């Protein structure tokens, strides 16, 4: 019986799934500085009195390999430095360019909005023609559809497109101002500006000057929406739904507000009460907000190690897998010496197939016999397995 239970334990272990360890984002190493001192040589020759000194050629070869490795590291660092400098210079140049563009007056915004509305009306007619003709219409066909001379039509088209460009370009500083508030959330500053600019273009197309408010007030909502959607869609390896990302943002704001009010870090209960949600839901959302960390993340000053090097592998080794396969084969060989009914009873009783041990009552119902009869069959089968000719095969697996 002891042998069989040990065997069953091995079978259950074989059926268990691997647990995945949730890493705390706090483990994430600090970002690498652009300027770092050059790497020192890793090898230092220590010669003991009894040690034979290597030939000069071999030593030179080793030094050459170290030199090549250091040159490659230096080249990689130089490229990273150039890339960072280029990016910073590009942003600086972009900010200088948009800073030269004059802001619009209220009357100019209204006039541009009218011209943009005329452009959108023309484009709607073009879309209708596209559906009818199943191709892009020519300028002549387009002008005829809007009942306008071709020259006048082209002037209207040019004015509308120029007005849209001017409306967008004159408000690019607004995009930069809003993008700064969303830095360090998973997207680079350039990407935030790009996404915010798309929101600004959408605002220029949807703006209704007859409502009475300024374009910048209206455009702010569209810019924020474009940026937050982009962060939700692109900043994570595992994408979160937009509504969940918005809830995470509200939790962060609430936590910051409570910290200012109380002068300390609020508890989960206090945050959940202010957010009007259960603690279980709050914990689920907080867990969803955690960012995954790559096992290839560099560790240490020299970045010569990876995070995965310090995490214990809890999976089976090849040796364990081979041992379990051999155990399974030997167990099948021993069970094959029993009668079919005895073999089936033991399989069901000790869960040798699916890992679930069934009761005598359950097995009796399957075989349409009493539980006492199943107990007798089980006892007889175990007596056979205790015979030295059978259990000697499995003894080596018992630890």
UniProtKB/Swiss-Prot annotation:
One of its GO terms (cellular component) is cytoplasm. The keyword Repeat does not apply. Residues 360-379 bind DNA. Residues 60-73 have a biased composition (Acidic residues). GO terms for biological process: DNA-templated transcription initiation. Residues 246-321 are annotated as: Sigma-70 factor domain-3. Residues 1-73 are annotated as: Disordered. This is RNA polymerase sigma factor SigA1. Signal peptide: none annotated. Pfam families: Sigma70_r1_2, Sigma70_r2, Sigma70_r3, Sigma70_r4. It comes from Synechococcus elongatus (strain ATCC 33912 / PCC 7942 / FACHB-805). InterPro entries: RNA_pol_sigma-70_dom, RNA_pol_sigma70, RNA_pol_sigma70_r1_2, RNA_pol_sigma70_r2, RNA_pol_sigma70_r3, RNA_pol_sigma70_r4, RNA_pol_sigma_r2, RNA_pol_sigma_r3/r4-like. A motif (Interaction with polymerase core subunit RpoC) lies at residues 191-194. Its main location: cytoplasm. Residues 334-387 are annotated as: Sigma-70 factor domain-4. Keywords: Cytoplasm, DNA-binding, Sigma factor, Transcription, Transcription regulation. It is found in: Cytoplasm. GO terms for molecular function: DNA binding; sigma factor activity. Interacts transiently with the RNA polymerase catalytic core.
